[in-house]
Amino acid sequence: MKGETPVNSTMSIGQARKMVEQLKIEASLCRIKVSKAAADLMTYCDAHACEDPLITPVPTSENPFREKKFFCALL
């Protein structure tokens, strides 16, 4: 740390304190295994599949974006 000004060392101490606080927060988080998280996600998706319009299509009569059918008549 030769040639370093006191301001820079103070800033690095402040940054180190912030990092320590962040690491303490992350260490205290409750973690679960990826396999359990994936299983929970699949269970949730299966339970809510009937409510998902991308899986269960909206009935044509209720679809506001359906194509309008135009009939041409020759006079």
UniProtKB/Swiss-Prot annotation:
The modification Phosphoserine is found at residues 9, 12. It is a lipid-anchor. Residues 73-75 form a propeptide. Coiled coil: none annotated. GO terms for cellular component: cell body; dendrite; heterotrimeric G-protein complex; postsynaptic density; synapse. The keyword Phosphoprotein applies. Keywords: Cell membrane, Lipoprotein, Membrane, Methylation, Phosphoprotein, Prenylation, Transducer. G proteins are composed of 3 units, alpha, beta and gamma. Forms a complex with GNAO1 and GNB1. Interacts with SCN8A. Guanine nucleotide-binding proteins (G proteins) are involved as a modulator or transducer in various transmembrane signaling systems. The beta and gamma chains are required for the GTPase activity, for replacement of GDP by GTP, and for G protein-effector interaction. This is Guanine nucleotide-binding protein G(I)/G(S)/G(O) subunit gamma-3. It comes from Mus musculus. The gene is Gng3.
